Structure formats: structure tokens, C-alpha cells
A protein has these predicted regions:
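Bacterial Sec-dependent N-terminal signal peptides
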Residues: 1-25
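Extended soluble regions of mature proteins
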Residues: 19-238
Length: 238
């Protein structure tokens, strides 16, 4: 606990720009198991790395076919997202890599998230947690599969304002994230306080709206197709 407190306080004097490159060093690594909609066979791990006021969330998944026991199969889409959160300035940046290797960049601020912290408490995996809710943003609000509210269970035992899936800004680490609709959720699996990791540098080319990296089918699909075409031309020139 003292280590975590020092980790945060030592960052106060390090207000820096978003153009940060973090080299390999000791840091905190938080592993979340991502529970998918249809079957535990589709579950996979996502990772959150933290050092001196900055976190990097890494979510990657190869395209694959999952066949649950009842002989139904579904395709898991390709996913590769790198998301940085500067929890001293509130700045968020993300790179999304598409299946054809096109790289997209978006930036926004944690102030876009409006949390309601409730009095509801419970214990998850030994952590005392409190419930908070906010509007989910993975799908458009008029989408028939919209998740409604995102529900975060966070612990002030680890007073770091981060969590999985771009949900930041609470006064403690998110231990579990779920939604009002659907079975999608993220569950804390492990915390390594002496991890070694080199932050992946964010590429700021091809800047788009944040929902072009968040929505799987993008907010501006025509723009994305044009970027992909240009990316292909650039590859062919090499």
C-alpha cells in the first residue's frame, strides 16, 4: 500500500506533454480477463501498465472462429488497440490498428466521462469495492445492442484512477467492469508490482474522431476507407 501511494505522489512534479516515450523500467502491470458475449472459449487477457502518472492499456486479439460446446460457431474480430492515459493532465490518446495494418490515431480527455458514484459496496477477490456508473460508449446510443450504463466496481485500496477499456477517472483502480445489457465484462485477474515493460510509442498520423477508433465499424466509415486506400498506395510505393 505504501508503495502504491509513493508511486502516485512521486508523479506530481512530473507534469509533462503528451509526447512522452517511456523506456523499460519497473512498473505496475494489471491483467484483466475480457469476458466475451457468447462463450468462455472467447475470453482473453488485456493489460494495463502504469508508471509515473501515465498508463498504457493494451488490447489485442487475433481473428478466430470460436466453437462452443452446443455446436454454434462465431467469429471473433481482429482487435489491436493501444491507449495512453495521462492521469495528471487527463489526456487520452489511442492508436487502433486495422486488419490491413492501417493505423488510426485519436485523442480526447477523461472529462468526457461523467461518473455517478453510489453507496453500494461489496468485496471482490479480497478488495473492498464501490459501485460507479457512467454511460457506455462502445456503441452508438441508438444501436439496438447498446449496453446502456457501464458499471465499474473500484477500490480505493489502490488509489489509481484507471481501469480497463478506456474507463478512467475514478478515485481507485477498477476491479471489475460490466454493463447493464449483455454479458461483456472485464475482471481483474492479476497485479504485478514489479513488471518490466517498454511503453509502445503512440503514432499521431491519420488523426480521426475518437469514435472512429472506439466503434468497431467506425463513426466515419468513408473517411476510414480513404485512409486505408492511401495507406495501401504508400505501401506500394516502397
Amino acid at each position: 500500500m505504501k508503495f502504491i501511494y509513493f508511486f502516485i505522489c512521486s508523479s506530481v512534479g512530473l507534469l509533462y506533454s503528451q509526447d512522452i516515450v517511456v523506456t523499460e523500467s519497473n512498473m505496475i502491470k494489471v491483467t484483466y480477463e475480457h469476458h466475451t458475449h457468447y462463450s468462455p472459449l472467447g475470453n482473453y487477457d488485456t493489460y494495463l501498465y502504469l508508471t509515473d502518472g501515465l498508463s498504457q492499456y493494451v488490447k489485442t486479439q487475433k481473428e478466430k472462429i470460436v466453437k462452443p460446446a452446443w455446436n454454434y460457431e462465431y467469429k471473433m474480430n481482429f482487435v489491436k488497440n493501444i491507449n495512453n492515459f495521462n492521469f495528471l493532465t487527463g489526456a487520452i490518446e489511442e492508436n487502433r490498428t486495422l486488419k490491413d495494418s492501417t493505423l488510426l490515431y485519436a485523442k480526447w480527455n477523461v472529462s468526457d466521462l461523467i461518473w455517478t458514484i453510489t453507496d453500494e459496496e461489496k468485496t471482490i477477490n479480497g478488495y473492498n469495492v464501490r459501485k460507479a456508473t457512467t454511460d457506455s460508449f462502445e456503441l452508438e446510443i441508438d444501436d439496438p445492442f447498446y449496453y446502456n450504463k457501464a458499471i465499474a466496481w473500484f477500490t480505493t485500496d489502490i488509489p489509481i484512477p484507471v481501469g480497463p477499456a478506456r474507463y478512467y477517472g475514478l478515485p481507485g483502480l477498477i476491479v471489475e467492469l460490466e454493463y447493464e445489457r449483455g454479458s461483456l465484462r472485464y475482471v481483474l485477474k492479476d497485479i504485478d508490482f514489479q513488471a518490466h515493460y517498454k511503453f509502445i510509442e503512440i503514432n499521431k498520423e491519420n488523426e480521426v474522431d475518437k469514435y472512429d477508433v472506439i466503434y468497431y465499424d467506425h463513426k466515419n466509415p468513408k473517411l476510414i476507407k480513404n485512409i486505408q486506400k492511401q495507406n495501401k498506395k504508400n505501401k506500394n510505393k516502397k
